[in-house]
Amino acid sequence: MAAYPDSLKAQLARRDNIREMTSDDLGSVIDVEIAAYEHPWTLGIFRDCLRVGYSCWVYEDESSVVAYGIVMLSGAEAHVLNLCVHPDFQRRGIGRLLLNHLTQMSRESGADTILLEVRQSNIIAMQLYLSADFHELGVRTGYYPDHEGREDAIILAKSLITDHDPMLGI
């Protein structure tokens, strides 16, 4: 049996921290949302995501929800509606782990494309998505509320039909 490098062992172990979101998680999810965003989603939006059957996931660190991801699957397309990591846990690879999970789950569900919108000002998220082989498709003008009015969203997409995906290590 081949020995895995310590960094890979740690990454594989951390995947176990991802599980499906339940309604019991919504209080913690809202706490993460409010800590991370100036214009957070409401509790009702998260309830609706669970109710309509979107693919909703949380990442736990020592039994506390510190991140989550929500994907709408529709035929051959997966749309990441929200991917958020609590500010105290950002820049630790949790966002990448969740993105990997959402991508793999979308592929396994039959999607051949995964897309998302990101605030033009969210440089850290843009770097994550571009490093994960997402490509810019366009701009949604005035998509997000902003303290000065509205902010544009960059539309990013990634093909899931390739045999080799460096983000997933395959």
Enumerate the predicted regions with their spans.
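Conserved catalytic-core motifs of GNAT/GCN5-like acyltransferases
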Residues: 2-4, 117, 130, 135-155
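Short amphipathic helical patch at the helix-1/turn junction of helix-turn-helix
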Residues: 85, 119-120
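Conserved GNAT acetyl-CoA-binding A-motif
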Residues: 106-117, 128
